[in-house]
A protein has these predicted regions:
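N-terminal secretory signal peptides
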Residues: 1-7
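Ser/Thr/Pro/Gly-rich low-complexity linker/stalk segments immediately outside membranes or between
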Residues: 35-45
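Extended, low-polarity segments enriched in aliphatic/aromatic residues
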Residues: 43-67, 267
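Catalytic cores of enzyme domains
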Residues: 162, 173-174, 179-295
């Protein structure tokens, strides 16, 4: 029987960043994973929640979906250009002139103070970690559509992959955790959950529309999601709580920026994975949270 390269459970857990057992304990049982099928059959592909967490079909807070409308992402304070509307143009201009800790104009001033946690090397660590959190600035491809480098089943002359929903969810969860995700979930896309998508991207202001098209599209003014898209895949990336607690110092920025950068890269990996299986996968075009409500 042909097998792919083997990997012990302990090694696989290390790759996922989940290995916390001692070497002695780890040697008690070391099953191996020969391929993705075996990973899918393992607990790695399961969504285990604490006993006090209960999954329900509807949110515990009642939502009047008939009244709910899609919101323009550019009108949130998560989007810097909207700051002026929240704090006033005069205050916004004053803050821009002095350069805050998070603005490039303030980097030099903060570093010159040479305070612990705000020194030059702290800033450098933060900037390095945050490099790819805005993929549209650096990627040669459109992040919404993905790299589109993986060969499709059609190009390979083979049928696209098809499986049962439960099998598919385990496969996607296993793949995403291997790529670096901490938790993975799926949400069905229907007339109600579509309202959670912004009408316009929070950062570049492109209109986000659903349309009867066969493939996703992107123009200079729009991002088009096919109506036949039925599922949203969501995932999280771990951050270090101790570093986050140091906000607004660079250590916190580095932790958050690294997670957002990793999130963009993980999304690209998922896009290529699903493309190779024969499916379209659209991702947020900019920093996580620019396409739909999140949190």
């Amino acid at each position: 029987m042909n097998r792919h390269s083997t990997m012990s459970r302990r090694t696989f857990m290390k790759v996922l960043g989940l290995s916390g057992a001692t070497a002695g304990a780890a040697t008690l049982a070391t099953p191996v994973f020969h391929d993705l099928d075996e990973v899918m059959a393992s607990p790695i592909a399961e969504r285990k929640l604490p006993f006090w967490v209960k999954e329900v079909d509807k949110p515990t807070v009642e939502i009047d979906w008939k009244r709910m409308q899609r919101f323009d992402g550019t009108q949130t304070v998560f989007n810097p250009p909207s700051f002026g509307k929240a704090i006033g143009k005069e205050e916004e201009e004053r803050l821009r002139k002095i350069g805050g800790l998070f603005g490039e104009a303030g980097y030099g001033r903060v570093v010159k103070e040479n305070k612990p946690g705000n020194r030059h090397r702290d800033l450098a660590m933060s900037l390095g970690a945050r490099f790819f959190q805005h993929p549209d600035r650096y990627a040669k491809w459109k992040p919404f559509l993905g790299p589109q480098q993986a060969p499709t089943p059609q190009q390979l002359g083979i049928p696209k992959y098809e499986g049962k929903p439960e099998e598919n969810s385990r496969m996607v969860r296993a793949a995403l955790k291997f790529y670096g995700a901490a938790t993975v979930g799926m949400v069905e896309l229907d007339e109600n959950t579509r309202k959670l998508f912004y009408s316009h991207d929070a950062f570049d202001k492109k209109q986000v529309i659903f349309s009867d098209v066969d493939e996703p599209q992107e123009t200079d003014t729009q991002r088009v999601i096919p109506n036949r898209a039925k599922w949203v895949i969501v995932f999280s990336v771990r951050m270090a709580p101790a570093n986050i607690a140091r906000a607004p110092y660079p250590a916190s920025q580095a932790t958050v920026g690294l997670a957002y950068s990793e999130g963009a890269i993980i999304a690209n990996r998922l896009q290529e994975f699903l493309r190779a299986l024969g499916y379209h996968c659209m991702a947020e075009s900019n920093i996580m949270g620019s396409l739909a409500n999140s949190g």
